Amino acid sequence: MRHYEITLIVHPDQSAQVGTMMDKYKEIINADGGKIHKEEDWGRKHLAYPIKKIYKAHYLMMNIECDQEMLDKLNYNFRFNDAILRSLIISKNKAITTPSIMMVNKDKEKGKS
């Protein structure tokens, strides 16, 4: 099995359903023998450019280990989910379990308050 980093940009009107959406994808990954090494919710952020006249979106990131068949199944689900504006799947050499830069910056901002 290979390691992947998946980043999703979700429509801001669907932010309340992010939890159930992630549970659905976790079930797909775990049912087929995959593993989730890290899952992060980056929250709402400004987009660099508007997508479908939307200027803010909800960002999610997962590091998973799965086979190509499961990855194709996930990608199919991402494409036909209207709530997902964009998805990015990057192949990685190994599992990454450390917090991402986005989460480290978020924790620093909370510490300053």
UniProtKB/Swiss-Prot annotation:
GO terms for biological process: translation. It comes from the Bacteria. GO terms for cellular component: cytosolic small ribosomal subunit. GO terms for molecular function: small ribosomal subunit rRNA binding; structural constituent of ribosome. The keyword DNA-binding does not apply. Keywords: Ribonucleoprotein, Ribosomal protein, RNA-binding, rRNA-binding. Pfam families: Ribosomal_S6. InterPro entries: Ribosomal_bS6, Ribosomal_bS6_CS, Ribosomal_bS6_sf, Ribosomal_S6_plastid/chlpt, Transl_elong_EF1B/ribsomal_bS6. CDD domains: bS6. Binds together with bS18 to 16S ribosomal RNA. Belongs to the bacterial ribosomal protein bS6 family. This is Small ribosomal subunit protein bS6. It comes from Vesicomyosocius okutanii subsp. Calyptogena okutanii (strain HA). The gene is rpsF.
